[in-house]
Amino acid sequence: MKRDGNTPLGGLNRTKDRHTDMVPNVKSLPGSRREIAALQSERRRVAFERARQAPWYRGKLDHIRVDRLDDPEEWQKIPILDKDALRRFDHAGFMREFCVAPRNRIAEYWRSGGTTGKPVFYPRTYEDVAFGLISWGRSFPCMGIDANDLCHIAFPIGVHPAGQVWARSAQLYEVGMAWVGAGNVVPTAAQLELIDTLKPTVLMGMSSFALHMANSAEARGIDACALSVRKIVCSAEVLSNAKRQKLERLWGAEVYDVFGMSEAGLMGAENAAHDGIHIWTDLFDVEVVDPETGRRLPEGEVGTFCVTPLWTNHATPFLRWNSGDQVSYIERSSGSGPYAELFPMIRHANRTTGFFKVRGVNVNHTEFEDEMFGIEGITDFQAVLETDAATDLERLRLRVEVGRGTTADAVDAQLSAMVKARFEVSVLVDTVPPGTLAAEFEKSIKAPRFVDVRA
């Protein structure tokens, strides 16, 4: 595979100095997996040296041998970092402990995602932003999106990078972009009108909002399959198989999943084979580890996803960041093309926090969602774990929206029977008007489909 230009390692320039890196040719890819391995070896050392500058890491890395960072046994001695550690600090404390860049190098801030806990605002230098744009933009050619496409982006356009950084990255890859924004800013009816007017071929947004848009279109007598959208790109929440199939059926479109986070960037995307998410391993050093021991797991085993950004680390040099995702690592795709040849994949299992315990019974969120979206008459739902005021016992309440031709009584009976048989818990079912849940979900970066409001 031919490299682009005269820069080494597939266009990713070597370190200019200990603080900044040269910006690469954005469309250049490494020439081989061997080349990526050499690049990872070099960049691990840069990441490690930058982390040693952060006050939080003082005393935590002294036992690590820098000359042995490529040895998994040595690398695994580095402590794993997670969001709970960050939430102990207010913003000023976080900046003191983790930020190693001077104020005059900070270009912008990226807000953390998530539906629980206090958000964290990560400083990003001009170099971080440049590499971040590459990480988001790579998703377009990986998914077969090019200059012949127009994307309608329905993520929030603001301090969270999923909207504005992704939209900006499209310009680098010569992909058309309609900067629409989330449904709480541009109402669903207006978004459908824009799709009808501008004729985008790609819809980018949370899977929950894409479902809501299709349901809203049906309520207005519009067949979403007859619209111009041919691909749907989902992010910010786990895409279950049932939800993917429902989106494909409602829109008549091919659905793609991607994977990323504010702590690092967009780390990968599916290709046309849809057999996993290809991870840009020249930009990110990734591990799937045993959550108890922190040791790397063999291919195919489910464990905790950890990432060390190799380039977006000029301000916050995180090592072995625990994203809270349960995934498996797969070396090869059944697909073809440079992304399949160069980059390994991950496959989602579920989030580590992805279960309710209802009176001693574990209810897995992903499995529950699969069952819910597999029911024909249900268009959307929210599961609420609450406390019964009369008995002081916990109970599960389902708020559901139903399609035309489906009665609330029929759904109540069907859901109660399904949940009891499949998950061995009883539920209360509330049918809410169409659009109720989407209006609530639009206020969050990630749809709060499972909510714990116990007293």
Report each predicted region and the residues it spans.
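AMP-binding/adenylate-forming catalytic core of the ANL superfamily
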Residues: 203, 311-423, 441, 445
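Conserved AMP-binding/adenylate-forming
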Residues: 230, 239-334
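Adenylate-forming
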Residues: 200-244, 254-263
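Conserved S/T- and glycine-rich ATP-binding loop of Class I adenylate-forming
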Residues: 51, 112-115, 151, 203, ...
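Nucleotide 5′-phosphate-binding alpha/beta core
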Residues: 2-111, 117-134, 138-142, 147, ...
